[in-house]
C-alpha cells in the first residue's frame, strides 16, 4: 500500500509576507518550482498540489524538479516517498480552460518517461493522481478517469497509416490509468457526498479513494458554520460508506489560517486535528508557511505528519437532520448580508496585495436571487476585505443560532467543538467605528447594519465573546481599519494599500 500523505502544500495566495527566496512579491514561474522543492525539503511536507489552471501553468515541473535537484530526488523518490498532485481545471465549469485540462492530462505520460530515465525502469510513477475541483456528481470524475484511459493512455494503439501506430512514433504510453480525487465545494454536494463516491466506486472499482473536502469556499458561499457542519456530515457519510463497501476512503481537507477558512495555523493546528477527526491530509497553504517563524512552522508540520488519525464522528440520522437544519437557517441569515456588502468587498479586494501571477480558481458565489446575481472575489480576498473593513466574516449570521432549542444546541456544540474559540479569535478584530464609515462610503443600508449588529450582540451576550481590541495587535488592527476606511473615502489609495498590508501582517494572513 502506498503512503497516504498527511500534509499537502498548496499555492493558495493567502500569505501576507513574501518569502525571502521569491524574486518578486508575486510568486510565479521558476519560483513556484523552487517553492515545491522547498515544501518537501525545508518544510517536510509529504505532497505538493500543482495547480494546472491558467495560461502560465508549468507542465514541465517534474522535469525541472528532477534536473534542478537530482541529489534530493534520488534519495526521496517522487511518487513513492513524496507526491506531486495536479489540480485540473474542471472542463464542465471552466470553459476557457478546457484545453488546459487536456494539455495537463497529456503531460502525465511525459512525467512517467522522465522518471524512467531518472530512476530506472518500473521504479515509480511520479504523477498518478489528479484533483477535479467543483465536483458535484460521480459522472464528472468517472469522465476524467475514462478520458485519461481512452484519450491519453490508449492513443498509442491508434493506427496512423499502413500499420504504423502511434507507439511506433512516440513509444508506449504509461501510466495506463490515473486516480481521480473529487474536490467537493458546494453545500449540497458535501452533504450528499456518498452518492458521488459510491457512483465512482461502482464504475471504476479503485482499490481506495482520496476525497477532498473544501472548507474555505463553502464558508464564503454559505457562512462559516454551514461550512464546518457540511464537512462534518461529509466525514460521517464517508466513514459509513467506507464501512459498508469495505473500501478505504482517505479524506483531505482544504484549510487556511484564519478561522473563517479553517483555522489551520502553526499556533492552532492541534485544535484543528481535534476538530476534524477522520481527516488524513491537511492543506498547508502559503500563510501557514510564510507568515510564521520557520522553526514553529516546521515543528507544526512535523507534528501533523506524525499525529494519530482518529476515526470520524459518526452521526445518527437525527443528529444529521439537526445539522442540516442549522446549515439552512444559517445560510438564510448570512447570504442577504453578504449580498448587501458585495460592493464594499469587491472595492477593497482589488487593493489587496497580489501573491500569485494567475487567478487560481474561479468563484462559486453567485446564487440566483430576486436582485440578480452577486459577483464576489475569491475566498482569500473576500475574507481579507471583510477583516479590513472591521467586520470579521465569522460573526455574520451567528444570530440564526437563536432558533435552536436546547437539544439542537447540544448537538451543534458536540459537532463544532472549537466554535467559541474560533469566534473569539476573529471577534478581536471587530471595529465598531467601521459601521458609520461603510455606511458613508458604500451606502450600506440601515437594515443590513442592524442585522450585523444583531449577530454581534448575540455573539457577545449569548455566546460570551469579547468583542473588539483585547490586546495590542487587535487594537492596532482596529486603528488601521479606521485609517484604511478614511483614506479610501478620501481616495488616497496608496495609503489605503499600505494599511491593508499592515493589517494582513498583524493577522498573519491576507485572508
Curated annotation (Swiss-Prot):
GO terms for molecular function: magnesium ion binding; phosphoenolpyruvate carboxylase activity. It catalyses: oxaloacetate + phosphate = phosphoenolpyruvate + hydrogencarbonate. Its cofactor is Mg(2+). Mg(2+) cannot be replaced by Mn(2+). Allosterically inhibited by L-aspartate and L-malate. PEPC activity is not affected by allosteric activators of E.coli PEPC such as glucose 6-phosphate, fructose 1,6-bisphosphate, and acetyl coenzyme A. GO terms for biological process: carbon fixation; oxaloacetate metabolic process; tricarboxylic acid cycle. Its EC number is 4.1.1.31. Keywords: Allosteric enzyme, Carbon dioxide fixation, Lyase, Magnesium. Optimum pH is 8.0. Optimum temperature is 85 degrees Celsius. Belongs to the PEPCase type 2 family. Homotetramer. Catalyzes the irreversible beta-carboxylation of phosphoenolpyruvate (PEP) to form oxaloacetate (OAA), a four-carbon dicarboxylic acid source for the tricarboxylic acid cycle. NCBIfam families: PEPCase_arch. This is Phosphoenolpyruvate carboxylase. It comes from Saccharolobus solfataricus (strain ATCC 35092 / DSM 1617 / JCM 11322 / P2) (Sulfolobus solfataricus). The lineage of its organism: Archaea, Thermoproteota, Thermoprotei, Sulfolobales, Sulfolobaceae.
Amino acid at each position: 500500500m502506498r503512503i497516504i500523505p498527511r500534509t499537502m502544500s498548496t499555492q493558495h495566495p493567502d500569505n501576507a509576507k513574501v518569502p525571502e527566496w521569491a524574486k518578486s512579491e508575486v510568486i510565479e514561474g521558476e519560483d513556484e518550482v523552487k517553492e515545491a522543492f522547498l515544501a518537501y525539503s525545508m518544510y517536510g511536507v509529504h505532497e505538493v498540489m500543482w495547480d494546472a489552471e491558467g495560461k502560465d501553468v508549468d507542465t514541465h515541473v517534474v522535469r525541472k524538479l528532477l534536473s534542478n535537484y537530482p541529489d534530493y530526488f534520488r534519495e526521496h523518490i517522487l511518487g513513492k516517498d513524496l507526491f506531486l498532485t495536479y489540480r485540473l481545471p474542471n472542463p464542465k465549469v471552466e470553459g476557457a480552460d478546457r484545453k488546459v485540462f487536456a494539455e495537463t492530462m497529456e503531460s502525465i505520460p511525459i512525467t512517467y518517461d522522465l522518471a524512467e530515465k531518472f530512476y530506472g525502469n518500473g521504479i515509480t510513477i511520479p504523477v498518478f493522481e489528479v484533483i477535479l475541483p467543483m465536483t458535484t456528481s460521480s459522472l464528472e470524475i468517472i469522465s476524467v478517469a475514462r478520458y485519461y484511459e481512452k484519450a491519453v493512455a490508449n492513443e498509442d494503439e491508434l493506427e496512423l497509416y499502413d500499420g504504423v501506430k502511434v507507439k511506433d512514433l512516440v513509444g508506449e504510453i504509461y501510466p495506463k490509468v490515473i486516480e481521480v480525487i473529487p474536490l467537493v465545494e458546494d453545500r449540497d454536494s458535501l452533504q450528499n457526498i456518498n452518492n458521488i463516491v459510491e457512483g465512482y466506486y461502482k464504475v471504476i472499482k479503485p482499490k481506495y479513494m482520496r476525497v477532498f473536502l473544501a472548507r474555505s469556499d463553502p464558508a464564503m458561499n454559505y457562512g462559516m458554520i454551514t461550512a464546518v457542519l457540511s464537512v462534518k456530515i461529509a466525514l460521517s457519510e464517508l466513514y459509513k460508506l467506507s464501512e459498508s463497501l469495505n473500501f478505504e476512503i482517505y479524506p483531505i481537507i482544504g484549510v487556511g489560517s484564519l478561522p473563517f477558512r479553517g483555522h489551520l495555523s502553526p499556533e492552532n493546528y492541534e485544535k484543528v486535528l481535534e476538530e476534524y477527526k477522520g481527516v488524513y491530509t491537511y492543506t498547508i497553504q502559503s500563510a501557514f508557511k510564510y507568515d510564521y517563524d520557520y522553526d514553529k512552522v516546521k515543528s507544526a508540520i512535523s507534528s501533523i505528519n506524525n499525529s494519530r488519525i482518529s476515526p470520524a464522528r459518526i452521526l445518527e440520522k437525527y443528529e444529521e437532520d439537526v445539522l442540516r437544519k442549522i446549515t439552512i437557517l444559517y445560510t438564510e441569515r448570512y447570504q442577504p448580508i453578504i449580498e448587501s456588502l458585495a460592493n464594499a468587498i469587491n472595492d477593497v479586494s482589488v487593493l489587496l496585495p497580489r501573491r500569485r501571477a494567475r487567478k487560481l480558481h474561479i468563484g462559486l458565489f453567485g446564487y440566483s436571487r430576486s436582485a440578480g446575481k452577486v459577483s464576489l472575489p475569491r475566498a482569500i480576498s473576500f475574507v481579507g476585505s471583510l477583516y479590513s473593513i472591521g467586520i470579521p466574516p465569522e460573526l455574520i449570521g451567528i444570530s440564526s443560532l437563536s432558533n435552536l432549542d436546547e437539544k439542537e444546541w447540544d448537538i451543534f456544540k458536540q459537532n463544532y467543538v472549537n466554535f467559541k474559540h474560533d469566534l473569539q479569535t476573529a471577534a478581536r478584530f471587530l471595529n465598531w467605528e467601521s459601521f458609520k464609515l461603510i455606511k458613508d462610503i458604500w451606502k450600506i443600508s440601515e437594515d443590513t447594519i442592524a442585522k450585523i449588529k444583531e449577530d454581534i450582540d448575540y455573539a457577545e451576550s449569548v455566546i460570551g465573546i469579547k468583542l473588539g481590541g483585547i490586546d495590542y495587535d487587535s487594537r492596532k488592527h482596529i486603528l488601521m481599519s479606521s485609517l484604511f476606511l478614511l483614506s479610501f473615502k478620501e481616495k488616497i489609495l496608496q495609503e489605503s494599500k499600505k494599511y491593508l498590508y499592515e493589517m494582513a501582517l498583524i493577522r498573519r494572513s491576507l485572508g
